[in-house]
Amino acid sequence: MTITETMLVPNFEDEAETGRKIAIICSKGNLDMAYPGLILANAALGEGVETHLFFTFWGFDMITKSRMHDLKFTPVGNTATHMPMGITPFPGVTGMATHQLKKSIADLGVPEVPEFLEQIVGAGGHLWACRLSADMNHLTDADLYEGVEGIISASDFIEKTAGAQLLFI
């Protein structure tokens, strides 16, 4: 786009489809890194934006039935927690930090990860699982959250989301 071109500004009062699309790649399975992608997806859907989430590598934990209810938050090596790094590896610290984060999130009325995924799918969001990650972890569709539309390759995801804004989390 050049300076002389008119910027595309969506008309949110128009009921017609905006043509906007966002693709969010969720690559982390920690509790604290699950929420940014889910919150952005929810916000995009609220604005009428076609929304696709692609779960890969550790982000697969967010959609794996056996793990999605038990995501953890570990402060080890995370200086943003403002905790003394010397105590973070001690037994119980991850459990305490996970409990505190879950409480803080719940106090704000934000749903837990499985309910958030359900909300996103209910609003028309699309969930995709990475074929390579599924194969590496010996997982099939039966192991995944029911709202996942399929296990696809990275190339297939790129094709499905052609022209989308892309976020890697």
Predicted regions and their residues:
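Glycine-rich loop at the start of a catalytic domain that most often binds anionic cofactors/ligands
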Residues: 63-73
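Short hydrophobic/aromatic patches at helix-to-coil boundaries
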Residues: 166-169
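Positively charged, low-complexity intrinsically disordered leader regions
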Residues: 2-14
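A glycine-rich helix N-cap at a beta->alpha junction
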Residues: 71-105, 109-112
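Short internal beta-strands
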Residues: 51-57, 128-131
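Short, glycine-rich nucleotide/cofactor-binding loops
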Residues: 23-34, 63, 104-108
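Histidine-anchored nucleotide/phosphate-binding helix
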Residues: 35-48, 53
